[in-house]
């Protein structure tokens, strides 16, 4: 019996998740990763709602819960560390506002779990230190191939090419062409992330301190010995963009935050300058990827995850969940089209599957990534009055919410309904 040949670019989250589902329908899947090894790094990510349902169907939910970060919730503090509002972790899915989701894990742990769940599956092969150089496609809508040249010198033909290679996707550029309009939507925020040694009184909360002048300092703690520090700013982009080396980036951040009235700002700037843990510093301008309708795919090439729909780290925190949902639906629609043509490669029409995948998943993305610049200005206010306003509103909201949901500490119902087609017969039974 023939099988579909699928090439996936990117071994992060969406790529391996798609490989998992495609393996179930007998596809021959090759995952190429530009890095010479698995990139099991990154900051804390969250899973919620349908993302948890998908991991449950994959059989990896227990593995994820075993490495869940012990974060208790989000805490707003003033420059002296006094708590102004606290939003506990939401186990019920009913809270008005809870940035800390039921399942919060480090990105590296999720990447490793997905890789371990797929690396020995029948028909799945990983190739590291390898990327797509270029590809071309046959014109025929059915039965044609996408012809790919890889950086290791090999050339092959596939029935489908999936670009799951992130926000700076090379696959996307090759698919759409260099003349396609710029897809990055700048959110007007610069974020820096680094690790610092923890202290005895550091809590396992997501602590947020707003600083006048359009800045904020945040911390999250996923392990006893370290704390993760986040610096956010709406100013100083020229200095930060000009900083190319690690030393220059540290100096630029120190100059921007030194002397500000931020909670423990002196401690964290000292860590940034002198602690070896802070050498993992990563800086980025926050942006979204928002492709126009119909642009998630072209012919037999299709985009997945941040390559197609990056909502941004401050765009609702749904990127990881979206990638898992997208991988599930894409593979499911491929399976449906494959069965519909009698599993005959000469009659398989990838475009039917990829267009339906976009139709089903796009509403989820659109509803959760419509963040405009005024919302960013609200989150990072310029004035002391703006900072106090945020703290007051947060305190009122937290007080109302806590009185309504206090004590709700049980995980979400394990029979939570699958809101997408049950392609593989693994969804919760009524």
UniProtKB/Swiss-Prot annotation:
Q: Does the keyword Chloroplast apply?
A: no
Q: Which SUPFAM superfamilies does its entry note? A: FAD/NAD(P)-binding domain
Cofactor(s) listed: FAD
Residues that coordinate or bind FAD:
11-14, 33-34, 43, 107, 282, 306
- Phenotype when the gene is knocked out: Abolishes the production of eupenifeldin.
- Which InterPro entries would you find in this protein's record? FAD-bd (IPR002938), FAD/NAD-bd_sf (IPR036188), FAD_aromatic-hydroxylase (IPR051704)
What are the record keywords, sorted? FAD, Flavoprotein, NADP, Nucleotide-binding, Oxidoreductase
Name a GO molecular-function annotation.
Answer: FAD binding
Keyword match Flavoprotein: yes
State the practical use: Eupenifeldin is a bistropolone-humulene meroterpenoid first discovered as an antitumor and anti-leukemia agent. This metabolite also shows anthelmintic activity against the parasitic worm Hemonchus contortus, anti-malarial activity as well as antifungal activity.
Pathway annotation from the record: Secondary metabolite biosynthesis; terpenoid biosynthesis
Mention one GO biological process in which this protein takes part, according to its record.
terpenoid biosynthetic process
- Quote the record's domain comment: Consists of an N-terminal FAD-binding domain with a Rossman fold, a substrate-binding domain and a C-terminal helix that bridges the 2 domains close to the antibiotic-binding site. This last helix is flexible and may contribute to their different substrate specificities.
Q: Note the PANTHER family from the entry.
A: MONOOXYGENASE, PUTATIVE (AFU_ORTHOLOGUE AFUA_8G07040)-RELATED, OXIDOREDUCTASE-RELATED
State the family it belongs to: Belongs to the aromatic-ring hydroxylase family.
Protein's name in the database: Flavin-dependent monooxygenase eupH
């Amino acid at each position: 019996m023939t099988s579909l040949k699928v090439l996936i670019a990117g071994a992060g989250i969406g790529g391996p998740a798609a490989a998992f589902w495609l393996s179930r329908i007998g596809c021959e899947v090759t995952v190429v990763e530009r890095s010479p090894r698995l990139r099991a790094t990154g900051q804390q990510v969250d899973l919620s709602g349908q993302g948890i349902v998908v991991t449950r169907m994959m059989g990896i939910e227990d593995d994820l819960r075993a490495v869940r970060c012990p974060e208790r919730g989000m805490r707003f503090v003033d420059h002296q560390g006094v708590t102004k509002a606290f939003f506990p972790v939401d186990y019920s899915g009913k809270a008005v506002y809870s940035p800390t989701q039921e399942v919060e894990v480090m990105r590296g742990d999720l990447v490793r779990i997905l890789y371990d769940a797929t690396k020995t599956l029948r028909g799945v092969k990983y190739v590291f230190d390898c990327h797509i150089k270029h590809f071309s496609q046959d014109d025929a809508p059915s039965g044609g191939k996408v012809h790919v040249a890889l950086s290791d010198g090999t050339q092959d033909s596939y029935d489908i090419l999936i670009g799951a290679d992130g926000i700076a996707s090379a696959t996307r550029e090759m698919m759409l062409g260099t003349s396609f309009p710029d897809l990055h939507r700048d959110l007007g925020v610069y974020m820096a992330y680094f690790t610092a040694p923890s202290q005895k009184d550091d809590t396992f909360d997501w602590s947020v301190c707003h600083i006048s002048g359009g800045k904020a300092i945040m911390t999250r703690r996923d392990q006893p010995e370290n704390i993760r520090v986040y610096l956010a700013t709406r100013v100083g982009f020229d200095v930060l963009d000009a900083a190319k080396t690690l030393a220059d980036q540290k100096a630029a951040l120190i100059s921007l935050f030194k002397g500000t009235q931020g909670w423990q700002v002196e401690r964290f700037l000292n860590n940034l300058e002198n602690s070896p843990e802070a050498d993992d510093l990563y800086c980025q301008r926050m942006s979204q990827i928002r492709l126009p309708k119909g642009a998630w795919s072209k012919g037999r090439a299709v985009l997945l995850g941040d390559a197609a729909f990056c909502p941004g780290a401050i765009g609702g925190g749904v990127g990881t969940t979206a990638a898992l949902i997208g991988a599930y639906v894409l593979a499911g629609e491929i399976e449906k089209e494959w069965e519909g043509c009698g599993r005959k490669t000469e009659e398989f029409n990838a475009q039917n599957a990829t267009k339906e995948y976009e139709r089903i998943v796009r509403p989820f993305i659109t509803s959760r990534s419509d963040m405009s610049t005024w919302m960013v200005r609200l989150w990072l206010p310029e004035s002391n009055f703006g900072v106090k306003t945020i703290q007051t509103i947060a305190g009122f909201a937290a007080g109302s919410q806590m009185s309504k949901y206090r004590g709700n500490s049980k995980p979400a119902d394990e029979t939570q309904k699958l809101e997408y087609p049950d392609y593989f017969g693994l969804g919760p039974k009524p």
